[in-house]
């Protein structure tokens, strides 16, 4: 069980929940440009397994690296950090 602490954990925003038991999460990271020093924003789209379909579009979630669950799914939902505000 202590082995799971070594897996990568990312925090991002849910941009799609149209698939059954799968969510798409955008993770934004910042990296300093090597020559100019400006911080550049990079984003990655990850597909994550959501067993109970609890995450909705706009939620801030934590996802953890896991074994391959399908051709594109390599992460699973750990927790919903902040729910989206419905207007």
From Swiss-Prot:
Pfam families: Ribosomal_S17
Family the entry assigns: Belongs to the universal ribosomal protein uS17 family.
Gene3D superfamilies in the record: Nucleic acid-binding proteins
The protein's name: Small ribosomal subunit protein uS17
Species per Swiss-Prot/TrEMBL record: Bacillus pumilus (strain SAFR-032)
Alphabetically ordered keywords of this record: Ribonucleoprotein, Ribosomal protein, RNA-binding, rRNA-binding
GO MF annotation list: rRNA binding; structural constituent of ribosome
Assembly, per entry: Part of the 30S ribosomal subunit.
Name of the coding gene: rpsQ
Function: One of the primary rRNA binding proteins, it binds specifically to the 5'-end of 16S ribosomal RNA.
GO cellular component labels: cytosolic small ribosomal subunit
Biological process per Gene Ontology, one example term: translation
């Amino acid at each position: 069980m202590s082995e799971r602490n070594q897996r990568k954990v990312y925090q991002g925003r849910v941009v799609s929940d149209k698939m059954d038991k799968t969510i798409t999460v955008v993770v934004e990271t910042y990296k300093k440009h090597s020559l100019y020093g400006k911080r550049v924003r990079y984003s990655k789209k990850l597909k994550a397994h959501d067993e109970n379909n609890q995450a909705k579009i706009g939620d801030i979630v934590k996802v953890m690296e896991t074994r391959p669950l399908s051709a594109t799914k390599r992460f699973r939902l750990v927790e919903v950090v902040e729910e989206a505000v419905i207007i």
